[in-house]
Amino acid sequence: MTAEELLKARAEALGGAVQSRSDGGNWSYVLNRGETPEEAAFALVTGTFFPAVEGDVLWLRTAYTVPERAEDLPVAGERIYLTSNVFICAGTVWIDGEKVFDVPYWMDITRPDVTVAEKAEPGRTHTVCIRLTLPRLFTGDGFHYLAHIGCQAADDLAFSVAAFSEELRYAASLPGTQETLDGIRRELCARIAD
């Protein structure tokens, strides 16, 4: 395997690992007319589509336990965050019982996101609750919504892999790139042989 093939395979493996990261999939939900739901009313989320009509309120919650590692990266001390797709309605987020995000319309926590823990402590459990209210002019038979809890370290890795990949594409377009890479490979092989 050439150095270029090895690097490409490693970048793909890292990219795949970042794309497959998960917050555990233990979200539960209630769809009602707005009142705070009873404990027994919550059901496990099994998809991203919620059948709903105008005026319905979607409550989502999870108990997220900070893992020791995410994508083989240590999590201790890292920032943990909540993000989701954009939802054009009122939205409120509570972390550990404290209201941390509240908008009357157009809930967008794709960026900026909502901090769950500034400095993660592995083993600690955080309760996250989201309340989404469908707008009065809502049409359709439901909506798609997906919330995700992530780790800043994994995001930083994803950005680094993507940025490095783009830098390699740019470098490959420059004249003399192959000759330069061949020279670097020869030099590295000579150093390894010594």
Could you say what each language-model-derived stretch is?
Residues 96-102, 133-174:
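Glycine/proline-rich low-complexity spacer/linker segments in large multi-domain proteins
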Residues 71-97, 128:
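Aromatic-lined ligand-binding clefts that engage carbohydrates, nucleic acids, or primary amines
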Residues 65-69, 78-79, 111-116:
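Short alpha-helical segments and helix-capping/turn motifs at coil-helix boundaries
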Residues 92-145:
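Beta-strand-rich ligand-recognition modules
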Residues 1-27, 154-191:
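Generic N-terminal low-complexity/basic-hydrophobic segments
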Residues 32-50, 59, 80, 84-87, ...:
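N-terminal regions that are enriched for targeting/export leaders
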Residues 65-67, 85-87, 133:
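Solvent-exposed strand-to-loop "edge" motifs in beta-rich extracellular domains
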Residues 1-76:
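Extended carbohydrate-recognition surfaces in non-catalytic/accessory domains of CAZymes
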